[in-house]
Amino acid sequence: METQRASLCLGRWSLWLLLLGLVVPSASAQALSYREAVLRAVDRLNEQSSEANLYRLLELDQPPKADEDPGTPKPVSFTVKETVCPRPTRQPPELCDFKENGRVKQCVGTVTLNPSIHSLDISCNEIQSVRRRPRPPYLPRPRPPPFFPPRLPPRIPPGFPPRFPPRFPGKR
């Protein structure tokens, strides 16, 4: 009787383990998060790039409003920056430091959150970096020359005799 009860209990446990085994793979195939999908897009960008160094996620814009269907393409917008890691090393970009004065690219496109659908449509454009000219050392501004109003001839009051005598003294 004890052995029948033990085998029945063992049968139930094996049934539970079987059901759990069926549920776990479906849980692992859950939808990716927005960030994970963008990181996957950055990996694809690094794979397809012909540049010398890897790029790493610098900034991730806000995710769009929640959509229930993970198979629907979601709009993404993010910024990547060049790292010090050479592309052939195949090192994860997250472990690489950003390159000083490295290239920065703004990327936009769509990704799907379903890991079984590899739908990525991303395009990246390099952001023109604004290189600042070094400031010259502080020098005081030269002062403008003082303002002197123009000199006007003295005003002659009316009725004042003319300054020069007439050419012909007898004629007026």
UniProtKB/Swiss-Prot annotation:
Taxonomic superkingdom: Eukaryota
Region annotation (Disordered) ranges: 61-80, 130-172
Family indicated by similarity: Belongs to the cathelicidin family.
Proline amide: modified positions: 169
Signal peptide feature range: 1-29
UniProt keyword annotation of Signal present: yes
GO terms assigned for molecular function: lipopolysaccharide binding
Organism in which the protein naturally occurs: Sus scrofa (Pig)
Record propeptide residues: 30-130
Protein name: Antibacterial protein PR-39
